[in-house]
Amino acid sequence: MRESFASLLATGAGKLALSLLFAATPFTSAYTFNQVPSPNLDISNLGRIAFAGDFDSISLYEYEGQTQETPSRNGTLLSRYPNGVFASINTTDADIKAMCNLRINDTERIVFAGNFTGVGNMPTPGGIALLNTTDGRVRALDGLDGTVNTLYCDKSGGQVYVGGLFNGLNSSNAIIWKDGWQELDFNGFNGAVHSIAQAAGGNIIFGGEFTGIGRGNASVASENATQIIPISSANISAQTNSGLPGFTDPKVIACKSDYSSGGAGQTWLLANNAPGFWKADFGFGFEPTRLKMYNTDFEGRGTKTFRFTALPDGGIMNMSYVDPSNGRTAYCDARCPLPQGNKTAQDFTFVNVVGMNSFRVDISEWYGSGAGLNGIQLFQDAMFSYAVNDFNEAQNCGASGTLSKASSTGNWQVSPSHNSNSQYLTTVLQGDPIRPDAASVTFSPDIKQSGNYSVTIYTPGCQGDGTCGSRGRVNVTATIGQGQSEEAILWQTNNFDKYDEVYNGYIDAAGGFQPSVILRPASGQGPGPLTVVAQRVRFTLLKATSGNINGLFEYKPGEKLDENNLADSVINAAGASLDPRGKALITSVSSSGQNLYVAGNFSNNDGRNNIFSFKQGASDPTALPNRGLNRQVMTLYQNDSMLYVGGNFTNTGEGNVQGLNGVAALVNDKWQPLGAGVNGVVLYLVPFSLNVTANQPEQVLAVSGFFDSVNEFNGNPSTNVQDFAVWVPSRSNWLHNLDFFTLAMSGRLMTFADVPGGERWFGGSVSSGSLLASGTAELNNGDDALSLEAFPVNLQAQQSGEAGVPSRKRAILEGQDMSTTGVRTGKFHTEGNNNMTILAGHFSTTGTDQQNITNLVIVDGGDSDKITGFSDELDANSTFTALAVTSNNILFAGGMVTGRLDNSRVAGLVTYDLTAKRFTPVQPPPLQGPNITVNAIAPRPNSNDVFVAGQFLTAGSLGCAAVCIWNTERNQWNSPGNSLSGVVSSLTWISDTQMYISGNLTSGDNVTTILSFNPSNNQFTAIPGAINLPGPVNALTIANEDGSQFWAAGQGSDGTAYLQRYNGEQQWMPVDSALFGPGTDIRGIQVIQVSENHESSDLISDNEDLLLMGQIQIPNFGTVSAALFNGTNLVPFLLATKGADGQTTDGSLSSIFVEFPAFFSQQNGKHLALWAIVLIGLAIALVLTFLLVVAGILLEWYRNKAKGYSPAPQSYPDRMGNVGRLPPEQLFGTLSVPRSRPTNYLFTCTALCIGMDVPTIHRRCNPVAHHKQLPAWTEQVRTEQTTETRPAINEDGCGTSIGGLLFRLPFSRARRISGDDVFDTILACSS
């Protein structure tokens, strides 16, 4: 049965962590992977460096052939790179179900098979091929028609036993390949074969769904098993005609209610005394088995000899017939006779069954004046129903009773046959989701008798009509009795023609019941377009059973088979005793040592429920402990003394072993759970190697099937997975529960084969990366080699409005709603002895204290990586896109943010106290406008101003579009000017007096993409030539030390990506656009130093590379998430993927964040360690301090000497004489008490006043109306109100207002005031 794994898994690729220590023990492989040159990046001057984006796994580009492109959603031939990542060697258009290795001509080969119709672009009819493990080349093993389920490589005999659902030579469902196809003695089985194994004694054991041996799906030789081929639907032509009215139309003999009748309008006559031909061209292919010719006797005319030519091959068919003169069987080919004057048909039987879509009857001899015919009928021993109803049996063409037919709903069009067998119907559907009832085709065959039938549906390949990109899944429902139906989900993504068996069993045709097959779109698909095709359905009447066989058969090679003694085999007898009788399903047979295990869906009163065993030499089968398992077993894997079992079971037959959910192990005749199993069905068990312990490779078990979680057990919580998990036997635990540096893998493994002395090969569909990391990863440079490391937090994707609900990720691309999932930005916060990593975007996770965290998470490396973050305070569908931390440890987080804090609305921006671990009491008033988004936050150096930019119109009630300033000291919004509007994508400070603003901007009347802003005078200056860039700037980074040069990237109006460098001299230098393929989206750029210089370029220094992030399409390579530009070429750097809706798709990077963003200020020369820099700075400070003290002492000594000062006497005759004048307690008692500060001393020297405005001095000096107590050296200037903000420094002195009066201290007076006054004033003003 052609059953795609994907048809069982409506959801698909899952994701799981796999241990990454492969590099310590490289694989030995005959298949060579070439390592690519190192990028030689020197990231030491950036400190810690990490990436943010929308991905589930990420890898460094290390080996040729390594790509970000996801494997076929159907099947892939897999090996592994030396770093352990799975490598796609070739792809198939459906599943690889079986593999084994065979040595052919002293070279190891892998035979692999399944339900595929092609490998790459090569057709593989029958679904089987041969792989050369040295060079990866594939050779199709032609000769089968159908699908293969299982293989067994007999290495001693140099041959392969093949089982499945197919025809080959004169066999069905089982055959041998040994340098070509060879039939088994018994010609196969009458049903599908699912498993083949060799028992300890050397006999071959077949398991499957069969009840007899022989060519089982050959049609039964019965009149009731034949079908008339509708010749009347063909395009009919002829050479020569008699010219007699009513006798010239060759079509009249193709469809008649009575073919023996003749005359005008019912007979076709050739020209007198001349040969000719009659030809029929069909829109479909067929394999005729019988021909009926009705000769004419009009006016003594008639056809004497003819030949039947099959087209397009042109072969003359060999036929047999009964000679009416003697009743004996005779044969003919080029000169087949028709009797003269015959009133009935002459029957001919084709000796060979040959496919054709056209034929020609060549008439060479005639009776009387010329040849002619009354009728012609063609039959086949197969019952088809075609979607194109013209190809079905026609009314009034000789057939009686129920006829085959088809009906349809929806908008279907007839498509040419292309490379297929026949024309077919096609419909293209739109919608999200696409409704299953949008279109359907119902096939109704001509079933004349009850019996066992094989029902197969044919699907034309997608390469012929070019629809491979839009094909999907269909639901096929076979109604095989009153109220009885069978459903199957089938993929139509096959490259070449295929057929799938949708039912095998009894059909009751009594009472006029007509079975049907309905094809419609499967549910859960969309958006469109979805292309659905419908071609034909076949009903094949099967032979009766042969022998006492029930899904299990033992074959003894080299011995002649005696069908009368089949029951002498213990294995055959054991199968025959299983229930249901004649319907037992054997899915897997496995041999190890002296034991043979048989598993499937069956039962028996002796305890053989769904699994049992044979011991070599035993006379009876052995039931396994606890009466087997309670439901179907799908797969077995034997590893030494341990048998692993996967299936749909939940317990033993006795129900007394808990935790056997879908997967279990049999050890020393005892059932053991794998944890507590999974919550679904396990279909495949595949071992592979991992270094779970450093440098100690061990076997782990990949578990694939249909499940979405691993069950809780022994304190290990239930974990969401997607159809894939890995069991680690040495730890008796699932890999995701173990704390390892991990590799990412999504998809499934279905089968494997080992090459002696080489690597293990796999079949499945796998996307893997060197690191499992959801949305963010850190880049390290240890031991002179780059590596990736995940942050110690497990981020889960969430969709809008579904906070905390894990779901598959969606791409975050320019122009899309940012409420989609992913990590958009991050921040390393290391100032003030902090060691925090802040990640922000749209996701959910769980904190250290088990609290729910959404969209912003904080990992505190200074507190054992404690995980905290934003909980439910803000709307869960918010998305953060920008972060910044100020010097007082306040986090600014912006994006598309909404919610309420302390019952106050916030929008676009929130502030969070990282010290107190709570939102600040005072939040910035909400930003306002349509689609409010903050894209950039940039605190001004050496200032209390935080610049916030993005898409908004006002901040609170203040009008400041696109860019606004939040002052952290006054807690208020300020506008940089009223002339700016548009959307800002980035802010970049060059110094505390210059900033670059990029995006899609308008300043005054100037439309541009990049502005320079000077906060000292609030002036915007357009960068020369920026208005001529192809489109808005999405990313900008500095290109030189003084910031006069920079890189800018974005997308033009036509969607084409651009990258240009501004050289600081009003000149733009574009990068060749041919380097970027269609669909490139550059979202971030960063200059990085290299340790080895590359070729010089006008665009970039030879010791630098430019890192591009986003989704980068490199021509002739594919998509990457990050690439390096060296001035000439793009080199792949990072490859990222993500899981989505059952598939794995390209991931993307949105930004880079580093510990030390000031790249150019640190890049020159060799870089010292931080501790060395601190010590050097301290030493310099001490030296300077010492020199200043010495200079001060010398200066004072010189001044005193110049004025004639001399040292005072140093004698102290009475040291205690003045103690009584001022007791010590009065002198020292006030030292611990704060010094009383007179509030009237409000002025200080010019240095204290410069830069102060009135509110600042008011706040610092606590002014009160005590001006009458002011020192005599102050001047009262005038009285005025002081509510306005005005400078406190003017050209001749400092001034402030106290009690409504403005006072001024002239500089001259300031220089003459006493030291005490100055001292008191400093204390007052600095408070």
UniProtKB/Swiss-Prot annotation:
Gene source species: Phoma sp. (strain ATCC 20986 / MF5453)
Membrane topology value: Single-pass type I membrane protein
UniProt feature coiled coil, ranges: none
Cytoplasmic-facing ranges: 1191-1327
Gene3D superfamilies registered for this protein in UniProt: Kelch-type beta propeller
Protein's UniProt name: Polarized growth protein L1
Localisation: Cell membrane
A cellular component term, taken from the record's GO annotations: plasma membrane of growing cell tip
Glycosylation sites: 74, 90, 105, 115, 132, 170, 217, 224, 235, 318, 342, 452, 475, 601, 639, 648, 691, 835, 852, 877, 931, 1000, 1006, 1126
Major subcellular location class: membrane
Keywords from the UniProt entry: Cell cycle, Cell division, Cell membrane, Glycoprotein, Kelch repeat, Membrane, Repeat, Signal, Transmembrane, Transmembrane helix
Superkingdom of origin organism: Eukaryota
Pfam families: Rax2, Rax2_2, Rax2_3
Gene this chain is encoded by: L1
Membrane-spanning ranges: 1170-1190
Signal sequence, start to end: 1-30
Extracellular face residues: 31-1169
